[in-house]
């Protein structure tokens, strides 16, 4: 478990070198008092593990840029991918001049997974209103990086909202494509609206030959139609099965991972090749935010996908 005495930790992503797991996580000081303030004071922490359980904290990987920059308020969720001997990190940035409303996606690179350099072209992916809704608190965040299955460049899957459908169920998987991880083309969403308001922290993986989409849904982001259809279902991490890593996915039939307090879950293979689920422990639905990252949970024990 990753627990820090002076900081809350929440959303995270993992880079696997084959010998070590590097975890990057959002963190904010508990001295803020109110856990809601953590969102506007987030930096990206870094820790290293050999077994996904015991973590050596390695400091802060990214902080917001100085006042006046496009990412001057907080640095949010992303993902890491290695290409041509260099690690590439896509992450979400917000700025203080608009109180963090406008979310944009940026690129940083590293040779050693410790020291990160922001790309001069940042932000590299911005919302395209042809396909994605601009709302008071804009949904354009949490990019998940993957190589194109056919070898044609790279894809980013993004938490986004469609421009049509019931307002409480417009959440979709946004999509951008790149030939080189620097130049990005925003494309139409990879899923249809209709179930949730937001599909947060998406990830795709090929689990024993089955393409799986994993995302998380907050209690107030479950659409009314789905809530009426599944009144006993709680919110949290959700698993949907697809036809490929780029969809389509059967989100209407998606299943919630039945682990209390778990949120922003990730799928990771351990050294034995077994799929494990990790997530941060929330607890705010019960009145107390926890802010720790769980130990791994074997996916097969959860009966998923």
Question: What are the residue ranges of the model-derived segments?
Answer:
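Carbohydrate-active catalytic/glycan-binding domains of CAZyme proteins
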Residues: 1-305
């Amino acid at each position: 478990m990753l627990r820090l005495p002076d900081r809350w930790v929440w959303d995270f992503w993992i880079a696997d070198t084959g010998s070590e797991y590097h975890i990057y996580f959002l963190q904010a000081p508990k001295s803020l008092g109110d856990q809601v303030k953590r969102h506007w004071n987030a930096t990206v922490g870094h820790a290293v593990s050999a077994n996904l359980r015991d973590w050596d904290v390695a400091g802060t990987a990214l902080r917001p840029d100085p006042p006046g920059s496009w990412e001057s308020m907080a640095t949010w969720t992303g993902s890491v991918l290695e290409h041509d001997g260099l690690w590439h990190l896509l992450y979400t940035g917000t700025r203080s001049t608009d109180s963090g409303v406008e979310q944009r996606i940026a690129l940083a690179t590293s040779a050693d997974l410790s020291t990160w350099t922001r790309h001069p072209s940042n932000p590299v992916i911005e919302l395209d209103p042809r396909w994605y809704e601009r709302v008071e608190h804009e949904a354009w965040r949490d990019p998940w990086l993957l190589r194109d299955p056919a070898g044609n460049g790279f894809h980013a899957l993004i938490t986004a909202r469609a421009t049509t459908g019931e307002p409480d169920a417009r959440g979709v998987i946004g999509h951008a494509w790149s030939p080189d991880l620097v130049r990005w083309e925003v494309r139409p969403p990879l899923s249809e609206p209709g179930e949730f308001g937001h599909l947060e922290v998406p990830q795709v993986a090929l689990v024993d030959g089955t393409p799986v989409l994993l995302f998380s849904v907050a209690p107030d982001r479950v659409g009314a139609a789905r809530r009426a259809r599944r009144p006993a279902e709680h919110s949290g991490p959700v698993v949907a099965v697809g036809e490929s890593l780029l969809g389509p996915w059967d989100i209407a039939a998606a299943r919630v991972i039945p682990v209390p307090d778990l949120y922003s879950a990730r799928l990771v293979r351990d050294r034995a090749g077994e799929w494990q689920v990790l997530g941060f422990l929330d607890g705010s639905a019960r009145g107390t935010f926890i802010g720790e990252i769980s130990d791994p949970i074997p996916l097969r024990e959860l009966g998923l996908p």
